[in-house]
Amino acid sequence: MALLVFITIGCSDDFLELNPQDQITQANFPESPEDALLATNAMYQVLRDARYHRGFFPIDDIMSDDALKGSNPGDALATVGPFETFEFNTSNEFLQNWWQTLYLGIRRTNVVLDRVPPIDIEESLKNRYLGEARFLRALFYSDLARGYGGVPLILTGTTDGTIQRASLEDTYTAIESDLRRAINLLPEKSDYRSDDLGRATRGAARALLSRVYLYQQQWDSAVFFAEEVINSGQYSLEPVYENAFDENFEHGIESVFEIGGIGVQGDINAGQNGYTAAQGVRGTPNRGFGFNRPSLDLINSFEANDPRMEATVIFLGETLDGIFIEGDPLTADVDDTGQPETYNQKVWTPGETVFSNREHNRRIIRYAEVLLNAAEAYAENENAVQALSYLEQVRARAREGNATILPEITETNPDALLDLIFEERRHELAMEGFRFWDLVRSGRAPAVLGPLGFQTDKHELLPIPQLERDITNNNLVQNQGWE
């Protein structure tokens, strides 16, 4: 099977500015130190593939109460629309593309892990390549585990031809193993040169492991790895919330892991435009297709004068960076439910008017999430003092010096405190792909999402794409409710 390999093109922006160069068979690649770098860089390209992001926002945001399909009313009704109403099926194109793209990433990490060890490279550099591969493989598998449950574990470049689902426990064990090994192999963020920022780091591996343990309700382990990040001295919160998403603060002090956003002109699948253009303002100014619009429910859920609402939602009539937002003439300014025409401000790209070559980085792990992971795990362990301390750090930054808003939370009842932490996660991490999974893992989904079409014992997991089941002669057992 051919492996598409990418090389750096010498621009000073970052190592992820990549172009297609050649096709080299896995049988003879990589062999040299130069090949090892190319193979390592090729893993990251999957994160920038439009098909990766086309799975992200319909599943992670539009299936929640935070976002709507968006675009104009008739656009993508058969592909994106069903995620808003829980009417998608096992043949949905976006689900299929997401599954295949995640396994493409896994395949590329396996090439590095299988073939880089024998290459004669300086040991610390080789360790870094292997650590990057283990982190990225864990990231891809964590998306699969969260979305589908137990999935096929393909941990080498070759298989015996029999592909079956592993248990969820075994899937998470593989993820944890990769991340623990990555922690020992990777450098800290501060050890990288500026042109290598965006590569996996020890802090990113620890932060992802904290998230993975949180999702498994292993509170002590979630606390341990969150504290490792907190105490590393590598990260802190940006003083101004909206700067955490600003182009001028990419790879900044709050960024634990983000995807570089230099796209390839003219290649819609290779570029980061799959993330920004899909969600950009539709109509005037022409910034994108307008999918994944913040919902009225999300807007109304913010506390009074919370700056994070304005930093998350673009409204018609606003002026951003000197550009007036008129919106889409095919979309009602306010529909019959009271929903205004809105857009996701966290993907706003100043001065950009074309779909390709978008330069907005996507933040995958922020330090704020790590603080909230710790707060939640401490609250679950009934340590309200520590939980409130980390919760207050997040809220204090959100105030931006205005003592009259977002009062400090003092609740110590465990259940009530957890409710407040989940609300804080909703507002701090809005439109970043957490809300649906937070509702599912906390048991809140039936009550919150039931009116939108969510069915208990079905929609907690996505369906295995039918095409994948056909390829494996139905060896992949379908998830409950999707048979």
Q: What residues fall within each predicted segment?
A:
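Short, cationic low-complexity segments
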Residues: 275-293
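Acidic/polar-rich alpha-helix caps and helix-coil junctions
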Residues: 11-60, 70, 79, 85-274, ...
